[in-house]
Amino acid sequence: MTIIRKKHPLIKIINHSFIDLPAPSNISSWWNFGSLLGLCLITQILTGLFLAMHYTSDTATAFSSVAHICRDVNYGWLIRYMHANGASMFFICLFLHVGRGVYYGSYNMIETWNMGIILLFAVMATAFMGYVLPWGQMSFWGATVITNLLSAIPYIGTTLVEWIWGGFSVDKATLTRFFAFHFILPFIITALVLVHLLFLHETGSNNPTGLNSDSDKIPFHPYYTIKDFLGVLILLMAFMILTLFFPDILGDPDNYTPANPLNTPPHIKPEWYFLFAYAILRSIPNKLGGVLALILSILILALMPLLHTSKQRALTFRPITQTMYWILVADLLILTWIGGQPVEYPFIIIGQTASIAYFAIIVILMPIAGMIENNILDLD
């Protein structure tokens, strides 16, 4: 068996990636989220495949086909809610994974980090298009509002929006193409994940100290396969509790009303995992400015390696920057809350303050904190 594992052209790739991979001996549970994201992706592809067998991407029947899946298909309700809540679990793991990367300075592995940002954009695009497919009120109006933002692009904006819509409004053509893209993107994401892993295995994993761990490695299997399996069990338990006991807690009640272009919902808002970016978008009164801020709210992650001023990699031994980091986390939670609130006083001013704080902490305060710590430790 050992000979096959190490000699077979295909199996040896798996062996070098998941079995005999040299891993730092001290990586904590924060390093579990990569494997959990892989599990989430597989779950989403499988449940999505079974949903696609019964779903019809036509404005006249899309809403009814989802109802049919829940009522008439064997365990259709379970597959549908696993897919919907699986997206939420996916984003929880994604945010924790990115947060880990920021905390421990993993962004210094630039290729891996940039690939991760591309993956984040791809997953967000996939989730947005998936939210349109049930063709409820929030699906329709969410698609209308978000795609309409592209009209802010000078000169080509209006033409671009109508090209994406396939007409003069969100309609049958839009739904059909969104279904096509929503189906194909997860497979593209899977390929990008392999590239992400390829880049990671070029440098090896980071660790909680931020120090070079080449002199202290252990094989991935059995140590981290067992450790990851514990994470998988915890995730599956949380996932099934959410799916079986509280399937609608993260959804919007408006999406149980069929899409009606003549009736606008009182508060148009995306799924919870986009609310922080939506709050940043809404906090700027100018349309183009809002769109740029929305894109920059994610793209700013690409600047992290350039904004790293400290001589130490991780935040483990850097209390000032640690404080900034946790203020940033709190700020993101505030933005998430604001994104779900109506556009009125005092929510507008809270959203604007939180948006300014978000960019200021990343671009100004954390780099300054790094330099102060260098001076305190006399590392300059």
UniProtKB/Swiss-Prot annotation:
It is found in: Mitochondrion inner membrane. Its cofactor is heme b. CDD domains: cytochrome_b_C, Cytochrome_b_N. Heme b b562 binds at H83, H182. The keyword Ion transport does not apply. Heme b b566 binds at H97, H196. Keywords: Electron transport, Heme, Iron, Membrane, Metal-binding, Mitochondrion, Mitochondrion inner membrane, Respiratory chain, Transmembrane, Transmembrane helix, Transport, Ubiquinone. Disulfide bonds: none annotated. A ubiquinone binds at H201. One of its GO terms (molecular function) is metal ion binding. It is a multi-pass membrane protein. GO terms for cellular component: mitochondrial inner membrane; respiratory chain complex III. It comes from the Eukaryota. It holds the Pfam family Cytochrome_B. Belongs to the cytochrome b family. The cytochrome bc1 complex contains 11 subunits: 3 respiratory subunits (MT-CYB, CYC1 and UQCRFS1), 2 core proteins (UQCRC1 and UQCRC2) and 6 low-molecular weight proteins (UQCRH/QCR6, UQCRB/QCR7, UQCRQ/QCR8, UQCR10/QCR9, UQCR11/QCR10 and a cleavage product of UQCRFS1). This cytochrome bc1 complex then forms a dimer. Component of the ubiquinol-cytochrome c reductase complex (complex III or cytochrome b-c1 complex) that is part of the mitochondrial respiratory chain. The b-c1 complex mediates electron transfer from ubiquinol to cytochrome c. Contributes to the generation of a proton gradient across the mitochondrial membrane that is then used for ATP synthesis. This is Cytochrome b. It comes from Microtus miurus (Singing vole). The gene is MT-CYB.
